[in-house]
């Protein structure tokens, strides 16, 4: 297991990020990242939580949008089919794409790896949090960017520019 902690310059909080080998993805040689941000967690510290038991599904790919979630405790796994994208731990966010994309269906399944607690954030509260807390907005943008880059690496390695014939290195 390799651990990496990075300083989130925009929010002045330390975001937790860890890379771990996933038994689910060993055949593909994929490394799963676990991610959480203490500053995001602080935004919902006093909010009531939804409790999930290990293996319980929060939402499935294709489900209608009903908000996004911030992980208060435990670990949620994000996957589509047989591919595990990421594990979200305390301070991590899941389901944000559905709000940002104007309520399109869920693009992945999310489930608890063990007992976990999440806080549901509806669309209006999400946009209020973005407007009132620029650091939260930057965090959401970074999460979206990181997940997009990961998807590019997983599904489109042949589209990388170093593989285009005729281009100089």
What annotation goes with each model-predicted range?
Residues 1-169:
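Cytosolic regulatory regions built on CNB/CRP/Popeye-like sensor folds
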């Amino acid at each position: 297991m390799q651990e990496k902690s990075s300083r989130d310059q925009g929010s002045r909080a330390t975001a937790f990020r860890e890379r771990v080998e996933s038994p689910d993805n060993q055949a593909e040689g994929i490394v799963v990242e676990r991610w959480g941000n203490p500053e995001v967690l602080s935004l919902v510290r006093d909010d009531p939580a939804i409790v999930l038991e290990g293996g319980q599904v929060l939402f499935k790919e294709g489900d209608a949008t009903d908000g996004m979630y911030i992980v208060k405790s435990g670990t949620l796994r994000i996957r589509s089919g047989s591919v595990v994208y990421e594990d979200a731990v305390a301070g991590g966010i899941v389901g944000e794409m559905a709000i940002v994309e104007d309520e399109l269906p869920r693009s992945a399944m999310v489930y608890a790896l063990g007992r976990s607690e999440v806080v549901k954030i509806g669309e209006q509260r999400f946009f209020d949090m973005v407007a009132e807390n620029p650091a939260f907005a930057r965090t959401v943008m970074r999460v979206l960017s990181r997940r997009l880059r990961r998807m590019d690496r997983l599904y489109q390695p042949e589209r990388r520019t170093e593989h285009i014939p005729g281009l100089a290195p």
